[in-house]
């Protein structure tokens, strides 16, 4: 796996699924391929994106700044600086300085990542802030190691939280989660359907599913009534894809 592929993997792991994630992936690919060279326009686009947390925006801004060649005098962006200040906690800043000194001695991506993984997310963000604000310099490879360590920690905590929700025994949470998943699956079906005859069929199925979820939420239904809703939808989607000659078995 190449270095940039690894960086892209880690960074995308902390972005919530949805159309925005697909757009960010496309822009990252362009940046890493040297196609997008207007850093200012890229940062302005990032700043105004909804849904993303300030820290995720800060990390993406840091990655774009490391990768896109820019004029030396280009202003640092406030939204990135604020996200990478470790919540203003002086302890984070102290640890960030210690980490920075260790990173200065590293020359490889993996070496930097290993060193960084033993620090808290706040300290890692502060250390990125030091480098972003030009208070310290490390090689791009080492900076990417720091980015990936931060993303790994964030993804770990997101995974723990997700696992807790998936394994919860609370029937109301499970019921709502199934309805949310069915609704997003229906939305994806509508986006994937083109304008053929079969597409109209897929759109109809998706539309009915969304109406059903809306009705279930409006009148309040038994928590078990949503069981299998998403799976039924996915079966419909796969049947539609088969007729269109597309084989995508990995939706579940």
UniProtKB/Swiss-Prot annotation:
<dbReference type="GO" id="GO:0039660">
    <property type="term" value="F:structural constituent of virion"/>
</dbReference>
<feature type="region of interest" description="RNP-binding">
    <location>
        <begin position="165"/>
        <end position="252"/>
    </location>
</feature>
<dbReference type="Pfam" id="PF08289">
    <property type="entry name" value="Flu_M1_C"/>
</dbReference>
<dbReference type="InterPro" id="IPR001561">
    <property type="entry name" value="Flu_matrix_M1_N"/>
</dbReference>
<dbReference type="GO" id="GO:0016020">
    <property type="term" value="C:membrane"/>
</dbReference>
<dbReference type="InterPro" id="IPR037533">
    <property type="entry name" value="INFV_M1"/>
</dbReference>
<comment type="function">
    <text>Determines the virion's shape: spherical or filamentous. Clinical isolates of influenza are characterized by the presence of significant proportion of filamentous virions, whereas after multiple passage on eggs or cell culture, virions have only spherical morphology. Filamentous virions are thought to be important to infect neighboring cells, and spherical virions more suited to spread through aerosol between hosts organisms.</text>
</comment>
<comment type="function">
    <text>Plays critical roles in virus replication, from virus entry and uncoating to assembly and budding of the virus particle. M1 binding to ribonucleocapsids (RNPs) in nucleus seems to inhibit viral transcription. Interaction of viral NEP with M1-RNP is thought to promote nuclear export of the complex, which is targeted to the virion assembly site at the apical plasma membrane in polarized epithelial cells. Interactions with NA and HA may bring M1, a non-raft-associated protein, into lipid rafts. Forms a continuous shell on the inner side of the lipid bilayer in virion, where it binds the RNP.</text>
</comment>
<keyword id="KW-0468">Viral matrix protein</keyword>
<dbReference type="InterPro" id="IPR015799">
    <property type="entry name" value="Flu_matrix_M1_N_sub2"/>
</dbReference>
<dbReference type="GO" id="GO:0003723">
    <property type="term" value="F:RNA binding"/>
</dbReference>
<comment type="subunit">
    <text>Homodimer and homomultimer. Interacts with NEP. Binds ribonucleocapsid by both interacting with genomic RNA and NP protein. May interact with HA and NA. Cannot bind NP without genomic RNA.</text>
</comment>
<dbReference type="Pfam" id="PF00598">
    <property type="entry name" value="Flu_M1"/>
</dbReference>
<dbReference type="InterPro" id="IPR015423">
    <property type="entry name" value="Flu_matrix_M1_N_sub1"/>
</dbReference>
<keyword id="KW-0472">Membrane</keyword>
<feature type="region of interest" description="Membrane-binding">
    <location>
        <begin position="1"/>
        <end position="164"/>
    </location>
</feature>
<dbReference type="InterPro" id="IPR036039">
    <property type="entry name" value="Flu_matrix_M1"/>
</dbReference>
<dbReference type="GO" id="GO:0042025">
    <property type="term" value="C:host cell nucleus"/>
</dbReference>
<keyword id="KW-0946">Virion</keyword>
<keyword id="KW-0694">RNA-binding</keyword>
<dbReference type="GO" id="GO:0055036">
    <property type="term" value="C:virion membrane"/>
</dbReference>
<keyword id="KW-1048">Host nucleus</keyword>
<dbReference type="GO" id="GO:0046761">
    <property type="term" value="P:viral budding from plasma membrane"/>
</dbReference>
<dbReference type="InterPro" id="IPR013188">
    <property type="entry name" value="Flu_matrix_M1_C"/>
</dbReference>
<comment type="similarity">
    <text>Belongs to the influenza viruses Matrix protein M1 family.</text>
</comment>
<protein>
    <recommendedName>
        <fullName>Matrix protein 1</fullName>
    </recommendedName>
</protein>
<feature type="short sequence motif" description="Nuclear localization signal">
    <location>
        <begin position="101"/>
        <end position="105"/>
    </location>
</feature>
